[in-house]
């Protein structure tokens, strides 16, 4: 490709890229100009620029200035260097452009750009469960298996990934929760209950906070720090060797220690130390740093009239030397980051302060933004993040170096009742989880590590929509539905530039990110053009993240495809037409040109052949070819009836529809037409140009750039949602449809994206189910016969090697001679949205709906995922990627679902021949003869000896069926099947009633009134008995012997209670 520098200049710049058409460069020459220029050379170049007219130099002049400073490049490298420097595209370089290029080179090497996160620190939904305590949890602790403090000689480089073993109790420990009634509950790291216990203790002053410091090696004495309500701090020091003073004693299930005995030295294993009245108020938080051999203790001083803001909020004690960190109102909580030698404090004054431990007079930074007192702070030193929680349950995340706010998390306000104010917090530094305890247990993951046993990491925070390779800068550009544009260096795996919030829209005062749906480069690949879902387009200088130009096709109409040719930009999407923008200097901001609107549905995809034509396809299966120079359509097809000629004119119904849609759009303004309305406009029974009633949508189109525009050469591939790829015979004005082939092997799958190599020998397809297929299309169509070396293809593509059974991918195409399927494997778990190919190193990379962009060799070997936390395999743009001696691994997510074909292709390993079983011999001959097969496999070494009966051992045998199953002949002569007529229905019988026992019958016939005698009584409190007084009878006979006998009995009893009453 050769582009003229300008119309007024005769200078021509040859744009050479690293491709199969360029000669191989034996030695890579660096284009990093900032590494080659010294300070003296830069001053001389500045003087030379100032001596030039207008302080500008041309193509040859700049090369001469560099030669004067002994900086030389060959022709190919200098061409690329000049295009990188010339950002104004006028082929004249001024001093600002030259210095900007040097600055960009230093920015690419800045390691801070690698640590910028794509997602918010707290982006995972919290887990909530009940505490199972009778009252509110007042304390949460962690039974640690590993210490957070590590000796300096054992400090290693921190990594941001894990292998999944940190969830075990041996690595993460157990949680312990306590409530006011003395109940203790033990939990696993996943908050599953283990057991329950109770605890009681007594001290002269109640202990309010504790801290425990220890090393894993056990060479340093462990420290147990106690802070009480009186402002005292006590330290217990003991050796952890052989469990120290906590050794089990025979006959004692529980070891009790009295503090007075510890002070008197009766327990020699424990060394106490007291700091009486270290603070005048209650100790709020304590910590002992073994690395600095220092004690930190804080207290709150809320009585401003008494202390007048001169209170020592935090005191650091080192070898009996005290350092006072004065904070108004005191300190409620703090966190010591020993790796950074800083202390982060928070208190009732709503400020988060960052201190240097050796400068107590003034904080290094003050973070403001909370509306309530700070109750919890902690630091992630490896991530350079500070987390703070206030009294109103709002979590804020800060950058430790730049002291900026990263995130405000308010989900706790919704999960916790407003009446719950005294919450307990604990941060698990190993699992990176924040535990919030009250009436509920809430676990919040704070910037969790990547589980490399489950995934290699993500490239974007949302599905990747477009991937591109820039041949000028030799980097990969990915665009996602998260509205991010990221520039990657594929040779080192580094992230060079990240641009966030690229397309935005304000809705009700809130800025909303708009998804990026299309992207491409300019012809010289200096600028990037992106299209979004709301119809906006932007031109980016993606080296400095600057927007050069803003455009739009139609409000709220998604851009599905963009094309950038010389002096023109073409955009198409849901507005059903092609919009042309000028790219000529001086005419950039004029009104765009609208091509004729012949499509009746939304445009889904488009492609261009430079200098010849453009092809567009719609959701309803329409395909139209356009002249690139004039924008006039010359051929129209329908994929449902591709051989039928369709005249390029609108029918009366379509003209009426167009006029109606124009009126509707003029009335609604920026309102968006739904896709369903656009599809249901044509009548279902009118199939003149649309084939069947159900439309077939076009998913992707691909132009073969090396195929000439003749009737005999096919040049366009069209992918349908049915899984087929139709081959349009030619984009010639008299060309037509030729053939089609099945491109998937699973029902419901279809090709979503396609690309090809520079010479159009292979076509790479990505499907909706995540499969990658490589097709050899040199002899497709069959009229163009070229000799193909099949052994060479088998060496490169292991998929083509013979197997003992035909796999599913091969069974589908076993009767299809052309095109030849050379590779097929599963690359992603979700749909593949975009695919691209790097020619010289033979690398294929894809952007998927699973948030990742992965690099593969042409043969199917896995190279890596952009944005991974694992080490990157070194690649070169001048050498072919992959070697036969290299061991390749599988992506962790693919490894769990991979088929035998995918495992063979990705690993590159295939068993030559399976083990054959020996022929069946008589039982007496088996022990004498060997079971050696023809292939050299010894089955006796594999299986040892034949299994003996019973193979399953002693087990329960199911009883046999008592009756045979009755065969049911279903009557299918009627319009429905009477199923109930064939069912066995057993009539119910009355159960025999058992006779009632005589005792129960006698009890049931009794009347409790027969045993009832009304009495009058009152309670005698002195004697704790009842004085019963029977009611008088109606007919009292004085001479009745029964009355005389009753009176005599009463006289004998006297006033005291009877023995029977006492017993009662």
UniProtKB/Swiss-Prot annotation:
The keyword Repeat applies. WD repeats lie at residues 153-197, 326-365, 369-408, 459-498, 511-550, 598-638, 746-785, 827-866. Residues 925-935 have a biased composition (Acidic residues). Residues 914-924 have a biased composition (Basic and acidic residues). Residues 914-935, 1023-1064 are annotated as: Disordered. It holds the Pfam family WD40. Keywords: Repeat, WD repeat. PANTHER family: EF-HAND CALCIUM BINDING DOMAIN 8 (PTHR44324:SF6), WD40 REPEAT DOMAIN 95 (PTHR44324). This is WD repeat-containing protein on Y chromosome. It comes from Drosophila pseudoobscura pseudoobscura.
């Amino acid at each position: 490709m050769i582009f003229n520098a300008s119309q007024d200049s005769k200078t021509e710049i040859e744009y050479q890229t690293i491709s199969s058409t360029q000669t191989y460069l034996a030695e890579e020459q660096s284009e990093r100009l900032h590494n080659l220029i010294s300070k003296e050379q830069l001053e001389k170049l500045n003087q030379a620029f100032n001596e030039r007219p207008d302080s500008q130099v041309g193509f040859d002049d700049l090369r001469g200035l560099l030669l004067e400073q002994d900086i030389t490049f060959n022709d190919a490298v200098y061409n690329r260097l000049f295009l990188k420097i010339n950002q104004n595209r006028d082929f004249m370089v001024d001093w600002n452009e030259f210095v900007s290029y040097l600055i960009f080179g230093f920015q690419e090497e800045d390691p801070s750009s690698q640590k910028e996160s794509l997602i918010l620190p707290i982006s995972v939904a919290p887990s909530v469960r009940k505490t199972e305590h009778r009252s509110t949890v007042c304390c949460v602790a962690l039974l640690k298996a590993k210490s957070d403090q590590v000796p300096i000689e054992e400090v290693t480089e921190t990594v941001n990934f894990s292998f999944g073993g940190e969830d075990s109790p041996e690595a993460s420990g157990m949680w312990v929760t306590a409530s006011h009634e003395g109940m203790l509950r033990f939990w696993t790291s996943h908050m599953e209950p283990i057991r329950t216990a109770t605890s009681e203790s007594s001290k002269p002053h109640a202990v309010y906070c504790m801290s425990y410091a220890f090393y894993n090696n056990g060479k340093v004495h462990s420290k147990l720090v106690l802070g009480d309500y009186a402002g005292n701090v006590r330290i217990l020091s003991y050796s952890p060797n052989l469990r120290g003073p906590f050794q089990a004693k025979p006959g004692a299930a529980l070891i009790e220690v009295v503090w007075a005995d510890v002070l008197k030295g009766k327990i020699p294993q424990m060394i106490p130390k007291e700091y009486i009245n270290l603070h005048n108020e209650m100790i709020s938080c304590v910590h002992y740093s073994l690395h600095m051999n220092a004690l930190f203790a804080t207290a709150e001083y809320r009585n401003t009239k008494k202390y007048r803001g001169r209170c020592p909020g935090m005191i650091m004690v080192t070898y009996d030397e005290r350092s006072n960190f004065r904070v108004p109102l005191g300190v409620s909580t703090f966190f010591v980051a020993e790796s950074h030698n800083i202390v982060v404090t928070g208190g009732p004054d709503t400020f988060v302060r960052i201190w240097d431990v050796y400068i107590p007079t003034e904080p290094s930074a003050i973070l403001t933004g909370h509306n309530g007192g700070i109750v919890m702070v902690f630091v992630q030193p490896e991530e350079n993040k500070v987390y703070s929680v206030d009294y109103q349950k709002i979590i804020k995340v800060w950058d430790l170096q730049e002291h900026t706010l990263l995130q405000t998390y308010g989900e706790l306000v919704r999960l916790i009742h407003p009446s719950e104010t005294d919450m307990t917090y604990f941060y698990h530094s190993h699992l990176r989880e924040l535990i919030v305890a009250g009436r509920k247990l809430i676990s919040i993951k704070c910037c969790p590590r990547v589980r490399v046993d489950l995934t290699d990491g993500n490239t974007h925070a949302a599905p990747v929509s477009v991937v591109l390779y820039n041949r000028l800068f030799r980097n990969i550009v990915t665009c996602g539905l998260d509205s991010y544009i990221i520039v990657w260096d594929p040779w080192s795996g580094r992230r060079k530039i990240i641009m966030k919030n690229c397309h935005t829209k304000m809705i009700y005062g809130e800025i909303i990110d708009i998804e990026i749906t299309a992207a491409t480069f300019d012809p010289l690949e200096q600028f990037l053009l992106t299209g979004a879902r709301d119809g906006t387009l932007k031109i980016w200088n993606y080296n400095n993240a600057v927007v050069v130009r803003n455009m739009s096709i139609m409000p709220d109409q998604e851009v599905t495809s963009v094309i950038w040719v010389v002096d023109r930009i073409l955009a198409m999407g849901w507005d059903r037409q092609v919009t042309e923008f000028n790219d000529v200097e001086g005419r950039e901001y004029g009104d765009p040109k609208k091509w004729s609107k012949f499509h009746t549905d939304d445009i889904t995809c488009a492609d261009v052949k430079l200098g010849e034509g453009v092809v567009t396809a719609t959701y309803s299966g329409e395909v139209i070819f356009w002249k690139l120079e004039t924008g006039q359509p010359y051929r129209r097809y329908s994929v449902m009836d591709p051989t039928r000629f369709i005249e390029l004119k609108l029918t009366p119904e379509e003209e009426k529809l167009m006029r109606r849609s124009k009126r509707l759009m003029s009335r609604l303004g920026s309102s968006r037409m739904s896709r369903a309305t656009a599809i249901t406009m044509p009548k279902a029974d009118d199939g003149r140009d649309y084939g069947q009633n159900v439309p077939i949508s076009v998913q992707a189109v691909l132009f073969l750039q090396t195929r000439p525009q003749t009737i005999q050469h096919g040049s366009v591939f069209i992918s349908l949602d049915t899984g087929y790829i139709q081959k349009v015979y030619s984009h010639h004005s008299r060309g037509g449809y030729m053939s089609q082939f099945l491109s998937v092997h699973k029902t419901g799958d279809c090709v979503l994206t396609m690309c090809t190599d520079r010479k159009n020998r292979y076509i790479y397809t990505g499907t909706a189910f995540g499969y990658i297929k490589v097709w050899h299309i040199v002899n497709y169509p069959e009229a163009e016969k070229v000799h193909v070396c099949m052994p060479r293809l088998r060496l490169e593509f292991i998929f083509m090697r013979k197997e003992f059974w035909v796999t599913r991918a091969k069974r589908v195409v076993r009767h299809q001679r052309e095109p030849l399927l050379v590779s097929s494997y599963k690359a992603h778990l979700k749909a593949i949205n975009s695919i691209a190919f790097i020619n010289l190193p033979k690398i294929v990379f894809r952007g998927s709906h699973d948030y990742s962009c992965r690099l593969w060799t042409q043969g199917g070997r896995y190279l890596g995922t952009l944005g991974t936390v694992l080490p990157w395999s070194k690649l070169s743009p001048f050498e072919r990627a992959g070697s036969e001696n290299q061991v390749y691994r599988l992506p962790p997510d693919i490894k769990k679902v991979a088929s035998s074909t995918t495992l063979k292709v990705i690993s590159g390993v295939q068993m030559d021949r399976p083990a054959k079983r020996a022929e069946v011999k008589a039982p007496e001959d088996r022990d004498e003869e060997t079971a050696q097969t023809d292939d050299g496999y010894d089955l006796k070494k594999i299986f040892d000896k034949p299994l003996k009966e019973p193979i399953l051992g002693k087990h329960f045998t199911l009883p046999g069926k008592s009756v045979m199953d009755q065969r049911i002949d279903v009557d299918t002569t009627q319009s429905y099947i009477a199923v109930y007529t064939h069912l066995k229905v057993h009539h119910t019988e009355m159960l025999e009633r058992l006779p009632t026992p005589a005792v129960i019958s006698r009890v049931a016939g009794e009347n409790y009134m027969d045993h009832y005698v009304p009495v009058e009584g009152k309670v005698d409190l002195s004697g704790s008995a009842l004085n019963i007084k029977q009611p008088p009878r109606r007919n009292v006979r004085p001479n009745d012997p029964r009355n005389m006998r009753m009176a005599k009995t009463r006289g004998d009893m006297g006033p005291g209670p009877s023995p029977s009453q006492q017993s009662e």
